[in-house]
């Protein structure tokens, strides 16, 4: 007699470029036959690139709820909540698993109202510092604590994030928070590196002795591109190497970024804006260093993908960064908001091809098993089963 499948309704904020989309896609596509998964999500915000091509690449279909938007809105939130309840009524899930803040609020509210047996939430990052003022931040903490108390389980994507959620922000007790790191299809980043590098260098007109430095991510205040531009200004005065800087991404600060690029270009800096690049695996292979300057992060995907591409990395010390970079081995971790220290470490990588090569090789060894999606699937299946057992 066939065993009844465990039905999982997976709800994600929105299908934009980033870790949550990959995470939700792999968990929908690759769970074993013991599970049946339905994926639901909102659409990207204005200025964001959608990630529906990622779902298409892996043959995943999703239900789109256009009313589920990042910013709170009474009317659209109420419509989204009702649509989620309708989906739950029809699908009859054993587990509702929400990913990120808006999906976590609306999805869990719908699941509680509809008496879903097991309700799980993953924090892909959090908004408890560097996003809002004190009053709004405290309100969000209050809401998250209330939701966490009713949830069957809470997932953090790094050990540091678990500590922040439990000890600093008091969202839930540490023993109720399970750490399950993200997982990715990393092999595509590591294959045919020489051919991919040659293609990108040719496409962008880069010579052999050019050092290509990129920052990849949403053009939003939290990503702190302003710090990156400060670093560029310091660097250009302190090396004779031929440098080319790339800004990859898009978002609300696009006009600011374009103005800064125009200014730096007038000062003789070769700096280029690409918007989003879909084939990031090929692009990465052509880079020499990939940077992250964020004020706050969960687990920054661009840094994992860079190391899978055997590219050296440098990042501010935020969120789960220490869980994904082997400091002084695959890259450098520096204090946030300190352009001088960041520039000094970046100069080491600029000046030494041998260090870049060593860091790149170490990076691939560091991430290839730790962040592969097969590990993610195994961890999540075991966690789901344990929660189902607890519910019996």
Which residue stretches match the model-derived regions?
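Conserved acidic donor-binding segment of nucleotide-sugar-dependent glycosyltransferases
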Residues: 327-328, 332-339, 348-354
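A conserved mid-protein helix/loop that constitutes part of the nucleotide-sugar donor-binding site
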Residues: 21-26, 211-234, 252-258, 340-341
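Short hydrophobic beta-strand element within catalytic cores of glycosyltransferases
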Residues: 312-315, 325
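N-terminal strand-loop element at the rim of the active site
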Residues: 10-18, 22-76, 161-166, 252-254
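Aromatic "clamp/platform" in nucleotide-sugar-dependent glycosyltransferases that forms part
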Residues: 276, 295
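A short helix/loop element that forms part of the nucleotide-sugar donor recognition site in Leloir-type
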Residues: 50-54, 190-206
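Nucleotide-activated donor-binding/catalytic signature segment of Leloir-type glycosyltransferases, i.e.
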Residues: 258-275
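A short, active-site helix/loop in glycosyltransferases that binds the activated sugar's phosphate group
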Residues: 150-176, 184-188
């Amino acid at each position: 007699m066939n065993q009844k499948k465990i039905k999982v309704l997976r709800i994600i904020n929105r299908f934009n470029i980033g870790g949550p989309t990959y995470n939700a896609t792999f968990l929908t596509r690759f769970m074993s036959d013991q599970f049946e998964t339905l994926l639901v999500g909102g659409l990207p915000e204005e200025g964001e690139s959608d990630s529906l091509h990622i779902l298409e690449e892996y043959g995943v279909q999703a239900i789109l709820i256009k009313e589920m938007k990042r910013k709170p809105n009474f009317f659209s939130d109420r419509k989204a909540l009702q649509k989620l309840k309708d989906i739950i009524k029809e699908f009859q899930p054993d587990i509702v698993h929400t990913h990120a803040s808006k999906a976590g609020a609306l999805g869990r509210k719908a699941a509680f109202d509809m008496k879903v047996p097991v309700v799980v939430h993953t924090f892909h990052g959090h908004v408890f510092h560097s996003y809002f003022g004190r009053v709004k931040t405290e309100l969000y903490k209050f809401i998250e604590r209330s939701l966490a108390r009713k949830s069957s389980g809470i997932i953090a994507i790094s050990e540091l994030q678990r500590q922040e959620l439990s000890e600093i922000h008091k969202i839930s007790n540490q023993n109720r928070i399970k750490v399950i790191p993200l997982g990715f299809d990393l092999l595509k980043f590591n294959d045919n590196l020489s051919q991919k590098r040659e293609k990108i260098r040719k496409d962008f007109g880069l010579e052999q002795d050019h050092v290509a430095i990129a920052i990849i991510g949403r053009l939003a205040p939290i990503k702190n591109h302003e710090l990156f531009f400060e670093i560029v200004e310091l660097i250009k005065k302190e090396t004779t190497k031929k440098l080319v800087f790339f800004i990859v991404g898009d978002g609300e600060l696009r006009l600011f970024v374009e103005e800064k690029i125009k200014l730096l270009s007038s000062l003789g800096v070769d700096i280029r804006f690409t918007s989003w690049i879909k084939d990031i695996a090929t692009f990465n292979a052509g880079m020499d260093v990939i940077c992250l300057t964020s004020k706050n992060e969960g687990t920054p995907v661009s840094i994992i993908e860079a190391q899978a591409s055997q590219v050296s990395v440098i990042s501010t010390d935020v969120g789960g960064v220490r869980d994904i970079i082997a400091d002084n081995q695959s890259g450098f971790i520096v204090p946030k908001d300190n352009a001088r220290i960041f520039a000094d470490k970046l100069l080491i990588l600029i000046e030494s091809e041998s260090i870049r090569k060593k860091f790149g090789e170490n990076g691939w060894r560091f991430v290839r098993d730790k962040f592969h999606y097969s590990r993610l699937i195994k961890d999540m299946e075991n966690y789901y089963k344990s929660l189902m057992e607890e519910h019996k």
